[in-house]
Amino acid sequence: MPTSWKNMTLNFWKTMSDSLKPQLLEYALGPALRAFSTTRQGGVSRDNYASFNINAYCGDEADSIRQNKQALCDELGIEPQRLIMPHQTHTACVRVVDEAFFASSAAEQQAALEGVDALITDQTRLCIGVSTADCVPVVLADKDQRVVAAIHAGWRGTQAGIAANAVETMCRTFNLRAADLRAVIGPSISMQAFEVGQEVYDAFAATGQFPMSQIARRYPSKEGAEKWHIDLWAANFLTLEQCGLPMEHIQVSGVCTYAQFDRFFSARRLGINSGRIFTGIMKK
């Protein structure tokens, strides 16, 4: 991986004057697509959920979540039932959202989204997305903008190869080539901020899939002793590249959630009972 990879960023802010509308970090993956990450601005949630959170699994008030979700759907021009997010559990499980999904009952849909950390679809006017607050969100699209994916890659999912699983499932299911995919790695914790224990380093090293000298370094901790830091941006970049995506097809937002917790939710800064970034992608 070249040393210049971190310069491959796309930071286009879409700022709205109306404070009750979400402010989005948008990604240019093609004119037929809408890809973005929400910021903390533009919603009605309070305290550590302020102000734009649509995740129902982190302790926010249900009415605030409903209002925020409706505001995002209004911005996207879709109905709330066309915004799909899984109940993530740090797995490497990938789910395809197709016509059969919508033909199933609400209970069946909920069950299908349980324990899933990546979604893929070829459906139009359907926004799929994942929730993060330091973990890495990744969005994918093929060059013809026919199929899209959203991936939640925490350290466990990254180590387990969820990005590779998503690429493989996307290509196999829809007869695509990895070389024709584009990817964006969204706001998440940087290596400098992501201090980990020896067990996390060992988990990555044990896979044999990661060049540890490129994704891990030791820095002095607050206590003085050196601790391992893992570069999740680099780990996911390398995984995508190993899958066959050309490096020039992989953009990195370069936004560290830990450093910019005033704009993006960070669980390490705010605690686990706080809001989540929603990173979504849809075919218009």
Show which residues each predicted segment covers.
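Active-site microenvironment for binding and transforming phosphate-containing groups
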Residues: 2-284
